[in-house]
Amino acid sequence: MLKLGIIGTSWIPHEFIKAAHLTGRYRLQAVYSRNIETAQNFCEPYNSISCYTDLVDFLDSDLDVVYIASPNALHFSQAKLAILAKKHVIIEKPAVTSPSEWKELVKLAREHQVYLFEAARNYQEAAFQVIKDFL
């Protein structure tokens, strides 16, 4: 069971958590928000979830994978810190704001032997249906 940490407290992470739980391979462990009340409100539907307002403390906790769904401008810095903390990282789209940021994250992920990927859901797009129909 992978211990999951969430950065971001909008509706999107709730949907991600539902999907992650359906796999039977993830357990929500912790949530990070810049505001403790926001974090606590987000955690209400879940049992025994740790809430953090300090990103370093969050990343120092016992997590295997971090899902980042914060404001886009924060994705790069938060992902970089998570990788340096040796956490696998899933970043909501758009993952970063420039190709150079993505290249840096990929390099760091390789060096720290963690997985990194963008949470793109292409299968929901019309173009993907055309490909599916073709196959």
What residues fall within each predicted segment?
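Structured beta->alpha junctions
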Residues: G8, N35, P71, P94, ...
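A contiguous active-site-proximal alpha/beta segment in oxidoreductase catalytic domains
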Residues: V96-L135
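Beta-loop-alpha module in the N-terminal Rossmann-like domain of NAD(P)-dependent dehydrogenases
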Residues: Y46-L108
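N-terminal Rossmann-like dinucleotide-binding module
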Residues: M1-Y46
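Hydrophobic residues in well-ordered beta-strands that form the structural core
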Residues: P13, I91-E92, L116-E118
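Short active-site oxyanion
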Residues: R27-A30, D64-V66, L116
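Short, well-ordered coil/turn segments that N-cap beta-strands
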Residues: Y26, K87, Q113-Y115
